[in-house]
Amino acid sequence: MGVVEEAHNVKVIGSGEATIVLGHGFGTDQSVWKHLVPHLVDDYRVVLYDNMGAGTTNPDYFDFDRYSNLEGYSFDLIAILEDLKIESCIFVGHSVSAMIGVLASLNRPDLFSKIVMISASPRYVNDVDYQGGFEQEDLNQLFEAIRSNYKAWCLGFAPLAVGGDMDSIAVQEFSRTLFNMRPDIALSVGQTIFQSDMRQILPFVTVPCHILQSVKDLAVPVVVSEYLHANLGCESVVEVIPSDGHLPQLSSPDSVIPVILRHIRNDIAM
C-alpha cells in the first residue's frame, strides 16, 4: 500500500468492471457507508477512503494551509484515483465530498463518469437571491461553540444534523465519528466547509451529476438542490427523498439506499 492509500485508509473491495468511489462528509468517516456497501460489492469494485482530518486519520498529516480550502481535498481524491490506476469511476459524494468530487472533475473529467451528490451545497451562507440555510452570525456562533466546548457542541449538533434524538443509533454513530476528530482540526474543517462558496465553478462542470436531497435537512434546504440543478453546466437531475436529516444514508437506509442504487445504475434520461 502506498503512502497516499495508507494516509487515507483506502480500502478496495468487491468485484466488477465498473468502479464506485465513496466520499464521506464532515464529522464522519468511511463507516458512514456501511448500509450501502453490501449492495454494491457483488457488482462493482468499491473504493472507500477517509478525508484527511477525519478521526480515523493521523492528525499529524493534517496540513492546516492545504485544507483551508476544498482544493486540497480534491487533489487528495485525484491522487487516490491515480494511485489505484482508476481510469474512470462513479463517484458518490456525501455533503462536502460532493463538492470535492465536482472540483476534482474540473481538473480531471476523464476520471469520472458520473457524480452522485448526497446532501450537497455549493454555499451554506445566505446571499442576495440565494438561500444557503445559514446567516453568517449563525456560523460565527457555531464556530465559537466548537472552540469553547467541543464535546458539548458534538452532543448538541449530532441530533440536529441527523434528525433524531440521542437514543437513535444513527445519532450515536454520528456523535462517535464527530467526537473522534481532534477539536482544532474539526474547527478548521468546519470553517473551510461552511465558509466555502463554489457557486462560480458550477457552470464549468461537465460530468453528469445526480443530486439527492432529504426533504428536511438542517444544513441544506431543498432550494439548494434546485440551485445546483439550474446552475451546473452538465446534465443533472434532482431527486428529493422523503427522509429527515443531513446523513440520510445512515439515518434512513431503508428508503434512501434504493434511491442511491437507482442513480448509480441508471444514467440521466435525456
From Swiss-Prot:
It holds the Pfam family Abhydrolase_6. InterPro entries: AB_hydrolase_1 (IPR000073), AB_hydrolase_fold (IPR029058). GO terms for biological process: de-etiolation; photomorphogenesis; response to karrikin. One of its GO terms (cellular component) is nucleus. SUPFAM superfamilies: alpha/beta-Hydrolases (SSF53474). Induction: By red light. It is found in: Nucleus; Cytoplasm, Cytosol. Its main location: nucleus. Keywords: Cytoplasm, Hydrolase, Nucleus. Disruption phenotype: Increased seed dormancy. Long hypocotyl phenotype under red, far-red, and blue light. One of its GO terms (molecular function) is hydrolase activity. It comes from the Eukaryota. In young seedlings, expressed in hypocotyls and roots. In adult plants, expressed in rosette leaves, stigma, sepals and silique peduncles and tips. Coiled coil: none annotated. The active site is at 95 (nucleophile), 217, 246. Involved in seed germination and seedling development. Essential for plant responses to karrikins, a class of butenolide compounds, structurally similar to strigolactones, released from burning vegetation that stimulate seed germination and enhance seedling photomorphogenesis. KAI2 is not required for strigolactone-mediated responses, but MAX2 is necessary for responses to karrikins and strigolactones. Lacks detectable hydrolase activity against karrikin. Karrikin binding induces a conformational change. Belongs to the AB hydrolase superfamily. This is Probable esterase KAI2. It comes from Arabidopsis thaliana. The gene is KAI2.
